[in-house]
Amino acid sequence: MENESTGWNENKTSSNIKKHEGLSFEEAAEVFDDPFALEKYDDKNSTIDEARYIVIGRIKRQIVTLVVYTPRNEKKRIISARYSTTNERKAYYERLRRIISKV
């Protein structure tokens, strides 16, 4: 399944729904629309053949979510998605506060 900028494997999203409290890749793709999302290179899981990135951002305007993706054919191919941990939410909101305080 794909949209204009994001892609994923349907079988993988089905297993992700079961494993991560009903979170589909289609829903998780909303994280890329969050202008305040945190994004970093995933040193631990990247290989020479495949770079991976971690994004922490909001979906449905309030739920902080973590998405792992790899760039493929000019799209962001989602590998995994889950709801964020307490520490990940804290990092997201601390960054958001810093951004807002500069305005």
Model-derived regions: residue spans:
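Ribonuclease/tRNase effector modules and their secretory precursors
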Residues: 1-103
